[in-house]
Regions:
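Short, amphipathic alpha-helical "recognition" segments used to contact nucleic acids or chromatin
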Residues: 2-19
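Flexible, charged surface loops at secondary-structure boundaries
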Residues: 16-17, 124-126, 172-175, 278, ...
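Short alpha-helical "recognition helix" segments of helix-turn-helix
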Residues: 23-26
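Basic, amphipathic N-terminal segments that precede the first structured/catalytic domain
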Residues: 31-174, 368-370, 382-386
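Histidine-centered active-site/metal-ligand motif
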Residues: 32, 138, 242-244, 288, ...
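Core catalytic region of metal-dependent phosphoesterases/phosphodiesterases
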Residues: 119-120, 124-137, 145, 150-252, ...
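Conserved beta-sheet core of the metallophosphoesterase superfamily
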Residues: 228, 255-266, 270-271, 278-285, ...
């Protein structure tokens, strides 16, 4: 017999009636542990009779705290001395992200696709393919040279990215395909308050929300258009980061809508924090790197892609998040390698205060479809003249 799902209101009434959790679980054909988790969720909405609280907030507005007015107890007071209480709630981040993603998909559904960019280059090899990870661009970041040693804003970011990316593409071989990867944190902030959605950290930003949002989409188009001119086929991998849970996913929808008429580009929007590409004997995984330990990624790949794991001989993860290039000493796990990539923006005030420092640049990694990893790796660093 299928279990009857108990609603929040039914559970509330059962508890008000004094029924024990073990009896409620039996009545609704539920396990005791599942019911206890439901009670925990119910308490998050404001139901806590042990502390004289019986509120009924929406599930997507969990209680963040209480402000209670108390006085010396009198006969008319509650047992706790409470006179009035204000319930403070917060918007559940996961529900907020899901709602925002649906809204974004609806808003951009009518975007007119861009004209198809013709391929006029030539293909030197189809046995290899190029991967270009764009490490944590943090578009919108602003730094002050007197504080961190270098000025950085939207205008500087646009100029530097164009110069460095052009030099990189010039030096890369003309493989048939390029895998262009947004490794996450494309935008420095995620809302109009200039914060991340997860931590609500206040960030140093160059101007208003719309200003750096527009600049970011222009820079992303520059990356993709340049790759479409050089490579016959482009696979765009979008991986949202911890700085841009919502806007990072919006990038995937935006790019897909703009280039949906171009058969030379395939877009992975970023619905999952883990994205995969298989080419010949090579299986690649892409993640920002903030949702789990890097050492857990080989097992994650084997679990998610167990069929492709068995059909390939070389497996490799490419991640962002840590802002430094670890390919020289990247970690070799049984059956899989894991590396992180560097970034182009300078360190912000927080990183500067923590004595962080690393070379700044972008790289192209050439993989061989038959043998896997190729020692060919071309890196372009930021120059003082950029």
């Amino acid at each position: 017999m299928a279990a009857t799902k108990i609603t929040h209101e039914q559970l509330r009434e059962e508890l008000r009636a004094g029924n024990k959790p073990v009896d409620i679980a039996k009545a609704y054909s539920m396990s005791h542990s599942v019911l206890l988790r439901r009670i925990k969720k119910l308490k998050a909405t404001g139901y806590d009779p042990a502390n004289d609280r019986d509120y009924n907030n929406p599930e997507n507005h969990p209680v963040a705290g209480y402000s209670t007015l108390v006085r010396h107890k009198s006969a008319s007071d509650s047992s706790t001395g409470k006179v009035l209480e204000w319930v403070k709630t917060r918007v559940d981040v996961r529900n907020q992200m899901d709602a925002a993603t649906a809204m974004i998909d609806t808003m951009i559904a009518d975007i007119k696709p861009l004209p198809v960019i013709p391929f006029k280059n030539y293909v030197a090899t189809s046995d290899q393919f190029t991967v270009i990870p764009i490490g944590d661009p943090h578009i919108g970041l602003m730094t002050w040279s007197k504080e961190v040693g270098e000025d950085w804003d939207i205008k500087i970011a646009d100029r530097v990215y164009r110069k460095v990316f052009k030099r990189l593409l010039t030096n890369l071989p003309d493989t048939e395909e390029c895998v262009l990867v947004n490794t996450g944190d494309f935008f420095h902030a995620d809302n109009i308050q200039g914060e991340t959605s997860r931590s609500r950290h206040k960030l140093d930003l160059d101007g208003r929300h719309g200003k750096w949002l527009d600049a970011g989409f222009v820079i992303m188009r520059m990356f993709i258009d340049a790759c479409l001119r050089k490579f016959k086929k482009v696979e765009f991998i979008n991986v949202p980061g911890n700085h841009d849970d919502i806007l990072g996913r919006a990038i995937g929808s935006y790019v897909w809508q703009l280039y949906r008429d171009n058969e030379r580009i395939n877009v992975q929007k970023g619905d999952s924090p883990f994205q995969y590409v298989r080419r010949g004997n090579v299986l690649l995984g892409f993640a920002h790197g903030h949702t789990c330990k890097l050492s857990s990624l080989p097992g994650k790949m084997a679990d998610d892609q167990y069929k492709l794991w068995g059909r390939t001989t070389y497996r490799h993860w490419i991640c962002g998040h840590v802002h430094h290039n670890s390919w020289v000493q990247f970690k070799e796990h049984p059956g899989c390698k894991v590396e992180t990539v560097g970034i182009i923006p300078p360190k912000d005030a927080y990183a500067h205060g923590g004595a962080y420092g690393a070379d700044r640049g972008i790289q192209g990694i050439i993989f061989d479809k038959k043998i896997g990893y190729s020692p060919r790796r071309i890196e372009e660093t930021v120059r003082g003249t950029d």
